[in-house]
Amino acid sequence: MARKSDEDTNPMDKFMDRLRGSPGDGGPGRPDPSQRKVHFSIWYFILALLLIVWMQTYMGEQQSEKISYSEFKQRVHDGNVQNLVIEHDRITGTMKENDGPGRRFNTIRVEDPELVKQLEAKNIRFSGDVQNPWLGLITWWLLPFAIMIFFWSFLMRRMGGGPQGVLSVGKARVKIFAEKEITITFDDVAGIDEAKGELEEIVQFLKDPGKFQRLGGRIPKGVLLVGAPGTGKTLLAKAVAGEAGVPFFSMSGSEFVEMFVGVGAARVRDLFGQAKDHAPCIIFIDELDALGKARGLNPIGGHDEREQTLNQLLVEMDGFDPRSGVIIMAATNRPEILDPALLRPGRFDRHVAIDKPDIRGREAILRVHVKEVKLGSEVDLKKIAGMTPGFVGADLANLVNEAALVAARRDRDEVTMADFQEAADRIIGGLEKKNRAMNPKEKEIVAYHEAGHALVAMLLPNVDPVNKVSIIPRGIAALGYTQQLPTEDRYLMTRNELLDRLQVLLGGRVSEEIIFGDVSTGAQNDLQRATDIARSMVMEYGMSERLGPLTYTRDPRSAHLDLGLGSRERDYSEMIAQEIDEEITRIVEDAHEKVRATLKRERGCLEKLAKILLEKESIDGEELKQFCQEVKSHIARDPVQVEGGAA
């Protein structure tokens, strides 16, 4: 289509184009469209209100002259007034002029019983009038205000936003990024090289579709990005659009569904219609599970509008030509609840898994985020990556930002390794609360509790090494913590490793039993985690010798979320349920007895570590390494073998 020349363009369209700003030319320093709309609306209402006030004042002054009541009485006495109208609170009329029409005037009415007699004596014509108080309000305020709102709504629609009215609820609330507005490329995405490699083919198709079509190949219509929250699914989708240099249509799955029946389906049709007009382009639907949940998954209280919207999405994905250059990308962290029809070949026929990054991936992500940060010479990104297992891209970005804030709070010129350590502790354990007052008895209990965890971890062979022990309160409920860091990324755990982890979790409570002959509530979280491990060993992993290699649960867990998606479905007898309970109890009690025997034997080391904690409140680095070596040397000289592993 030929572009209109400047001469053919409507002046109103030119003006609105200036207000909107042409797509794609928003550079640094240029306000985004939403800011322009806000600024325009503020100035519009200020000027409109000033105009209304000015019109009332000016027009009132032009229509009549205000005079005092004494001057009015004098003019009545002189016979220089005519056509008086006496209202409830004022008197209006016309002054007689010798050389032209009379001037209108008004005055405040005063309670004057003699006025009517004087008017009759002077043969002045007068009448009474009852004024409606609402008429002036409507005429001078409500009507101008309604006109002002109408024009504002019209201008907002012309600027591409604002209230659209009932007739436009079916329009897709899509965020459109033009080619020049997307500055993110694959260089800004790190730690997920496998996923980037999967999507390079999509970029090549958008750049050169003929390369694939000449051999009869068909590019995937849809790409589903699956991964845990914060792994970079949205960032990766934008990077694909940035690499290909095509428009990017972004919309959340929850924005399709409304309370009005049919609105979601209309928005799906509108979204695909806009995308076809801007092809080649990318449609990105974030949180697809809000829209694409399997039909019939919740038959009681189901959502007909959501299912109707999903049906329309399925129809649209079937209806467009894959050669049109429109690629659909979506992201979810709950693929197991999506409708099977959405995942079949021909719709989302390519699934790209985005896992949590390994240590090399975390180091690469950190290098991306520290580009604008002044780092100290001793900062080791590889070491930071090693002490942040399980962190995803969003967590690492937050870590770098927190470290920079810690350094700024301490008035440093650069971010040091200590700042990164403090930031990691803050993210993992919560805000440090040195001012939380604990009495000496509580502090001693916490010290022995954490010393018990740390000492058991030092003595057992199948657990992660201890990195830091602290009795400084953090977060909402943590009065102390023992930090263990893995030496490498792990994807499997053996039975012996799980049993040793049980012993570490029980070390704090057993330490309290041995030293004080009593237990506290501080072990609540430890006991919960220990019970969960034992239950999983029996019911999910088949690690119970008594029950054998069987699984006794149908818990619909998400592979990308640390929670179950529903209640466990029980399909075993009461006798098996009793045996499961007995086996879970046995595993935990066996671990408890082993820890008790170990800490009784190493009570001297336990008391020494607790004493250090009471003095310094926190142990890490070289001092902790030295203590660990002393403990291991002591154990090497002791002929008694530390119990660990099989139960």
From Swiss-Prot:
Chief location of this protein within or outside the cell = membrane
Record-annotated residues binding Zn(2+)? Answer: H449, H453, D526
The GO terms this record gives for MF are: ATP binding; ATP hydrolysis activity; ATP-dependent peptidase activity; metalloendopeptidase activity; zinc ion binding
What's this chain's function? Acts as a processive, ATP-dependent zinc metallopeptidase for both cytoplasmic and membrane proteins. Plays a role in the quality control of integral membrane proteins.
Q: Which ranges does the record list as Periplasmic topological domains? A: 61-134
Question: Got a GO cellular component term for this one?
Answer: plasma membrane
Q: What is the lineage of its organism?
A: Bacteria, Pseudomonadati, Thermodesulfobacteriota, Syntrophobacteria, Syntrophobacterales
**Residues on the Cytoplasmic side?**
1-39, 156-647
Task: List the Gene3D superfamilies.
Answer: 1.10.8.60, 3.30.720.210, P-loop containing nucleotide triphosphate hydrolases, Peptidase M41
The molecule here is called ATP-dependent zinc metalloprotease FtsH
Which InterPro entries does the UniProt record give?
Answer: AAA+_ATPase (IPR003593), AAA_lid_3 (IPR041569), ATPase_AAA_core (IPR003959), ATPase_AAA_CS (IPR003960), FtsH (IPR005936), P-loop_NTPase (IPR027417), Pept_M41_FtsH_extracell (IPR011546), Peptidase_M41 (IPR000642)
Record's cofactor remark: Binds 1 zinc ion per subunit.
One BP term from GO = protein catabolic process
Cell compartments where the protein resides: Cell inner membrane
Q: Which residues form the active site?
A: E450
**Source organism per UniProt:** Syntrophobacter fumaroxidans (strain DSM 10017 / MPOB)
